[in-house]
From Swiss-Prot:
The entry's keywords: ATP synthesis, ATP-binding, Cell membrane, Hydrogen ion transport, Ion transport, Membrane, Nucleotide-binding, Translocase, Transport
SUPFAM superfamilies: C-terminal domain of alpha and beta subunits of F1 ATP synthase (SSF47917), N-terminal domain of alpha and beta subunits of F1 ATP synthase (SSF50615), P-loop containing nucleoside triphosphate hydrolases (SSF52540)
Leading EC class: translocase
Species for this entry: Ignicoccus hospitalis (strain KIN4/I / DSM 18386 / JCM 14125)
EC number(s) given by UniProt: 7.1.2.2
Name of the protein in its database record: A-type ATP synthase subunit A
Reaction catalysis annotation: ATP + H2O + 4 H(+)(in) = ADP + phosphate + 5 H(+)(out)
Gene this protein is translated from: atpA
Length: 596
């Protein structure tokens, strides 16, 4: 029996309703005559506090509030990829067709998945009537896009992963809509019809069998990220930075070039023109791993700053639920959230309207636990169903601290829960050094875990070279103060070599043009070769300096090769690595000729 109450008070996106006996926490309710979507966030006696995911302008006391009896859930099934949704997973293209308007009308109800489209269903050949099935067992597959084969699973909220149901019937191969029954199972004496889609509550993590340490790097094609501060598949990372430092471009680079199988891009409370830019450009980008259009592996959730504040909070959970769903199929999914600061501001706004006690800078006291809930849904895991498979959810989120202050609550709490911290620096951005990742503040706790992959697939010397590159950059930072005070002439010859090598690292390796067709994506092999040239140059030059050869002489001898190395970012394609091998040989030859 649906709960029926009425509006008592309206405070922006928060509505207080009375006569709500029997309503449950996080239950979805329809508010007002237009049936606006809301979620119960607090219950006191017969009163319920509801956060509404649509504009509440014009709602008056006394209007009806009707419970739906279920928590806020999203539809999971074929038809999610290559589409754009709003913060509560309503497809924007369908809304545009129904509303005949560029704006989302209040109370509009459009299903997330297309009910009329027919999909090519292929049943699992290993299953037959009478077999026992559990939650997350694969019933069959659907080619959702040319890149992704959608695996239709037994919903774990219909048949638990630790229980068994009997398969009564499995649909033969053919074309079906998502509303057609594709299997019938008997569980606890009841026959249950299964369809290609099911609903899942966004605040509830999907079950896993066991979680593993992430050991495979997420290859992004960005040299400073892959080599100095690597992210692992199943890892968590944050990109904090002040206004204009390049957060959105860095995240877009991750979405476009990373080797994740499925990318969910959540624009949470950011500007509408940034989301428009993604929409305009992504269909033209090609996936570097397959050559297919990028949209075939991407889901976009647009929840811009002019959309209702409450929907920002939901959009983050919607995104991570989609990522977990594709992880359960055995894929590596990447969730990109831009930005969690706007999400935290939405929490602050709603908490203020609910008259909750504020904590630091007005944020609610539970900010840290909400951030922890979100980041803990990342990970590499074994999925409980059959056939056995392993998938991962990687989370990379932007943080927008006001004025670039990393001590503010959202950034400081985020640092506790993420293992990769890519700190963007306004001074580097203003100096046109992009990506503006500060190598002195940033860190990655996955360096040792992903080193094995680099050693087995690229070179056993990867970690040795990477650590030496970091130590050169750290030494150069110590020397910069001396150079500022007394000039570079006062430095010893070994210190001058550190300064010169650090300059080459910054110009040839750390800087990267996200809009150049060649430099936008740098393969792991090219990254290693460029690093090898720089570090072996430094080692050989150090021997010469110790033998009495001045740094000025070394610089003059290899100036053409250094210029060519810097140009190689734009001139050497990922499949033309013999050019870098040739450049390495010329470097060593020139340096050998200087031996006293």
């Amino acid at each position: 029996m649906a709960v029926k109450g009425k509006v008592l008070r309206v405070r922006g996106p928060v509505v207080i309703a009375e006569d709500m006996q029997g309503v449950q926490m996080y239950e979805v309710v329809e508010v007002g005559k237009d049936g606006l979507v809301g979620e119960v966030t607090r219950i006191t006696g017969d009163k319920a506090v509801i956060q509404v995911y649509e504009d509440t302008t014009g709602i008056t006391p006394g209007e009806p509030v009707v419970g739906t009896g279920s928590p806020f859930s999203v539809e999971l099934g074929p038809g999610l990829l290559s589409h754009i949704f709003d913060g509560i997973l309503r497809p924007l293209e369908s809304i545009h067709e129904v509303a005949k308007s560029p704006f989302i009308k209040r109370g509009i109800k459009v299903p997330s998945l297309d009910r009329s489209k027919k999909w090519e269903w292929r049943p699992n050949p290993e299953l037959k009537p009478g077999d026992k099935v559990s939650g997350d067992d694969i019933l069959g597959t659907v080619p959702e896009t040319p890149l992704i084969e959608h695996k239709v699973m037994v919903p774990p909220n219909v048949v638990p992963v630790d229980k068994a149901a009997t398969l009564k019937w499995l649909a033969p191969a053919g074309e079906y809509t998502i509303e057609d029954t594709i299997a019938v199972v008997e569980y606890e004496g009841k026959e249950i019809e299964l369809k290609m889609y099911h609903r899942w509550p966004i605040r509830r993590p999907r079950p896993v069998k066991e979680k593993f340490e992430p050991v495979t790097p997420l290859i992004t094609g960005v040299r400073v990220l892959d080599t100095l501060f690597p992210m692992a598949k199943g890892g968590t990372g944050a990109i904090p930075g002040p206004f204009g430092s390049g957060k959105t471009v860095t995240l877009r680079t991750l979405a476009a070039w990373s080797d994740a199988k499925v990318v969910i891009y959540v624009g949470c409370g950011e500007r509408g023109n940034e989301m428009t830019d993604v929409l305009v450009n992504f269909p033209h980008y090609k996936d570097p791993w397959s050559g297919r259009p990028l949209m075939e592996r991407t889901i976009l959730v647009a929840n811009t700053s002019n959309m209702p504040v409450a929907a920002r909070e939901a959009s983050i959970y919607v995104g991570v639920t989609l990522a977990e769903y594709y992880r359960d199929m055995g894929y590596d999914s990447l969730l990109i959230a831009d930005s969690t600061s706007r999400w935290a501001e939405a929490l602050r706004d709603i908490a203020g309207r609910m008259e909750e006690m504020p904590a630091e800078e007005g944020f609610p006291p539970y900010l840290a636990s909400r951030l922890a809930e979100y980041y803990e849904r990342a990970g590499r895991a074994r999925i409980p169903g059959r056939p056995e498979r392993v998938g991962s959810v990687t989370i990379a989120s932007a943080v927008s601290p006001p004025g670039g202050d990393f001590s503010e609550p959202v950034t400081s709490h985020t640092r506790r829960f993420v293992r990769v911290f890519w700190a963007l620096d306004a001074s580097l951005a203003y100096a046109r050094h992009y990506p503006a990742i500060n190598w002195l503040v940033s860190y990655s706790l996955y360096v040792d875990t992903v080193a094995k992959w680099w050693h087995e697939n690229i070179s056993p010397k990867w970690k040795e070279y990477r650590d030496e590159m970091m130590s050169i950059l750290l030494k150069e930072d110590e020397l910069k103060e001396i150079v500022r005070l007394v000039g570079p002439e006062s430095l010893s010859e070994p210190d001058k070599l550190i300064i010169e090598t650090a300059r080459i690292i910054k110009e040839a390796f750390l800087q990267q043009n996200a809009f150049d067709p060649i430099d936008a994506f740098c393969s792991p092999k090219k990254q290693f070769l460029m690093m090898k040239i720089i570090i072996d140059f430094y080692r050989k030059a150090k021997e010469l300096v110790n033998a009495g050869v001045p740094v000025a002489t070394i610089r003059e001898a290899v100036k053409e090769e250094v210029a060519e190395l810097i140009r190689s970012r734009f001139t050497v394609r990922n499949e033309e690595l013999e050019k870098l091998e040739d450049l390495y040989a010329r470097f060593m030859e020139k340096l050998s000729s200087l031996s006293p």
